[in-house]
Amino acid sequence: MAVTFYSGFKDKFHALDFLTDNVFTGFQIKNKICIALKGDHELEEFSFLRNKKFFETKKIEFLCLKNLTTITDKFEGEFDEIHIFSDKISDLPGSLNDNTFVYTLKSDEAINNASRELYTNLKNKGVNVLHEVI
């Protein structure tokens, strides 16, 4: 099991844009996807980006909500992929797979602090933590 942390985004828009592209890849292989977002504002921005990408690419997958779950605080259920851009997720359930991604942002101190705590908790559990600077 491994969790990938992405960092180095210029702002929230770029982080959500990258997240949206990653989610679209999951839709192509019909994964059940969970997205943990900081709050309603980020959910609105994610929805805006999904629609924008649909109009730019004409790929219907961006409009598919059937296999997409969004949360703001805790995980319930099993997922093929988990994407986290939240300040409320500091630990993860034990039944994770290699398709867990965490997006961090220096300009959002709450998300950055929660990501650091999550990183520490995962390392203490012996989870393989990967880091990629974007």
Regions found by a protein language model. Give the residues of each.
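Glycine-rich, aromatic-bearing surface loops/beta-hairpins
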Residues: 99-134
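Active-site acidic carboxylates
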Residues: 45-46, 74-75, 115-116, 120
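A generic structural motif
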Residues: 56-73, 129-134
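Mid-chain, well-packed structural core segment of small domains
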Residues: 63-102
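Residue-level preference for the first positions of well-ordered beta-strands
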Residues: 3, 32-34, 81
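Glycine-rich phosphate-binding "P-loop"
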Residues: 1-15
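Short, well-structured hydrophobic secondary-structure segments
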Residues: 16-63
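Structural motif
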Residues: 8, 36-40, 84-88, 105-107
